[in-house]
Design a protein with these regions (language model features):
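Alpha/beta-hydrolase-fold enzymes
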Residues: 1-29
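Short beta-strand/loop motif that positions the catalytic acidic residue
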Residues: 66-68
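Active-site nucleophile elbow and catalytic-triad environment of alpha/beta-hydrolase enzymes
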Residues: 35-56
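Conserved alpha/beta-hydrolase "acid-adjacent" motif
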Residues: 73-83
């Protein structure tokens, strides 16, 4: 949340849309503390699926559309999506496209630019058909 000071809430990193952040805060199934084991399992899984032998299991001709916000701290402030695209290309996946949305944060489908995101995804799908 340090990137978004002054902060209105501890969850401002999720979206620029204050209503969406408030919905997250008020949802009893969101924002709860995770156990150390949960984090260990999550991170171990992410490490495992990013290995070359795992990426090679994805069909190399499968079209992929990666998108995110350039202010998403989980996506390394816009660096994660292009890095993933590069890694996929290095493993022989040649039909990979990405788009970063300026100033957008973590929850792209709950962002202030969500209409653009939905339209861009729909356009990409149509191009694949």
């Amino acid at each position: 949340n340090n990137h978004f000071k002054p902060n209105r809430t501890n969850f401002d990193w999720l979206s620029r849309d204050a209503d969406q952040v408030d919905k997250y805060i008020n949802d009893p199934l969101c924002g709860f503390p995770c156990s150390a084991e949960t984090w260990q399992q999550l991170l171990s899984g992410l490490i495992e699926i990013s290995k070359k032998d795992q990426l090679d299991k994805i069909p190399h001709t499968l079209p992929m559309y990666l998108f995110g916000g350039d202010k998403d701290p989980v996506g390394r402030m816009g660096k994660g999506i292009p890095a993933l695209e590069q890694k996929l290309r290095q493993t022989g996946h040649d039909n990979v496209t990405h788009k970063l949305y300026k100033e957008a944060r973590h929850e792209m489908l709950n962002e202030t630019c969500k209409d653009d995101v939905y339209q861009d995804v729909a356009n990409w799908i149509e191009q694949q058909l």
